[in-house]
Amino acid sequence: MSLDLNSMLKSYESATKSVRATFAAVLDADSFVELDAFITGENELGEPTGEGVVSGFASIGSKDVAVLATNPDVFDGGISALGAKKAERIISRAIESGLPLVSFIDTTGARVLEGIDALAGFDKILAGYARAYGQIPVITVVKGKCFGMLTYLSGMSDAFICYEKAEVATTSPLILSTSGSISCLASDIAKNAGFVTNIVKDDAECKKVIDRLVSLLNDEMADNTDDANRVCKGLSASSDVRSVLNEAFDKNSSIEMKASSAIEALTAFASLDGVPVAVVGVDGKLTAKGASKITDFITTAGSMGMPIVTLVNSTGIVADANQESCCLVRNVSDLIYAYNNVSVQRIALVMGKAVGAAYSILASRSINDFCLAWNGAYIAPFDGASAARLTEGEEIAKAKDVEAAEKKFASIYEADNSALSAARKGYLDNVILPNHTRQYLIASLRAI
């Protein structure tokens, strides 16, 4: 049945209501300009129904972006060969124009009846993402469902954002349920699997997160009114890495990624005196999952050309037989490789302790352009108590008060391995007071 232009547009807009509602809430008002609107699927009567993919250009926070969305109102967001063609075209245009790619996913997977045509379509989308990742900022948002092969976009996205009630699975949840009690909720996956970078509760929060990410990932100088010489009154020798992120970097500039996974490891984007930076932090023992989390983040920072600031308060790598037999060695090896091969400026700050591998892997002179430490920080192969038992075990055993003797020898060892001692040997560029952290980080960044 033939339709005139107005009828076609009216039918198409009606079939893409959900997508347009999301665009209206997240994108800048009236900024969306659609492309390839007439590439549409057909219903059983041969009439246009609107395609499972909507694409075009828009702006978020006055910053231009390329936009791609699957349409849950058409075959549950099932992607056809035509839909894949639209996706491939907007991805290519984003790469050519150097614009961030922002995708909104709500799909149950491929259209089964299209057979190999649908599979070939997914190949084009995955190949497009693989080309885009590392060249332009890639942000993927899951609002409803993400079932099937598009789940793998998480590994080719700088940010993989999910709404609280979103569901993510590589196959149908019905199939997964036969394998046991497995949750497909993004909020659970964020804690357990670690590929969800941010959880948002609504469109307003989603808009805020994307706006900040686009600003930071675009490697543009951010608008900044925060004094470069501001004293960080909230920092002290007992502050943790997240306190440093909040206190020392530009006010309201930071956004933590994968916050609920491997919580000993901090990964966040922020700015220092308007310069976008990637922030890595370790509080306590680093786990296999934490090492993997940091490695992925370093890869993203490297592809975006962002300087890396590493905050260290760690006693090394976790001692866990289960993790060792699984993936600990491999994940830590990958982390070492990533730090040593990323081609960006690197600054390290030892806040409390950098013991054993924590120093060598994260804070050493060999992988950092600038190395700083707080006054009172401790850098050594072992913690004081362990070193005392290893080196003075016989003397401690002979002592009338074993506990007091151990503390005595531990304190001597710690004094011999203080930050000041490391600085005298040339392993640190400076030893600073915690409340001067901001000034010295900015000065170090300017110097390199």
What kind of region is each of these model predictions?
Residues 1-448:
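Ligand-binding clefts of soluble mixed alpha/beta catalytic domains
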